[in-house]
Amino acid sequence: MTLLVALLSLTAACGGAESDMSATQADDGPTKRVALWGAEGGFVTATMNVLRPPRAVLYSDGLVIVDASKQLKLTDAETGETVASMETYLTGQPPTAEPKPGAPMVTDVPTTVLGVRGKDGKMLEVRAPALDQVADFYPKELSEAKKLMDGLATRAAAAGTDYVATRVRMVAEGAASAEGKPAPWPAGVPEPSGMVDPIWQKDIEGAAVSAIIKAVPAGQEHGRSLFKTSSGALFVLSWRYLLPDE
């Protein structure tokens, strides 16, 4: 799993061109998400929790975005088949599925989120805690739905192009006790303001996007993303591209 963020001690990131497909807004246009696979919770940092995108999102125009870092375009037929299959797998499932009795207790792992846009236009989402660990105790349809979306993610990683966008979500995490020499706060990037507990986040666009990408390039090691604000506060700065409908 990759994220275009600075804390790449947890993940690796990708950057690049090909922004034409990612710049379309999803308000009233064709790019409404119609299927998704993601994760919530688990033992992750506060920054990762805020920046973690869906593992794979399929939009109605066939655009697949994986980890907010790779993209792939499906045909209309592939898009329709994927949505139909996801609807079959998820229809009738409860909003939060529970494993059958006898499942082992698993803690500190993410909850799998699977979703599909139904014929009524509403997004149906099903959450399955610890699906990866106790899949045999869940209805097989949930594993099949995840397998289907995982296949799209694998295709995008192998044959897709880099996903970039004109908007970015940035996160500054307080790092008063961090080791290493901090760099001056990058010019053009908003400094944290107000409450920072333990993070501060902001969605940015325009020149600020170019500034943060220059200051914290995709793939940069965690230890090199330490910055000092004009007031002397230390923060680890991270970011990822926003999805079209975020």
What are these regions (language model features)?
Residues 1-7:
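Sec-dependent N-terminal signal peptides
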Residues 10-13:
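C-terminal motif of bacterial Sec signal peptides marking the signal peptidase cleavage site
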Residues 15-43, 95-246:
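Short, well-ordered, aromatic-rich surface patches in folded extracellular/luminal domains
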Residues 78-103:
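Charged, amphipathic alpha-helical segments
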Residues 4, 48, 104-106:
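Generic marker of residues within folded, mature protein domains
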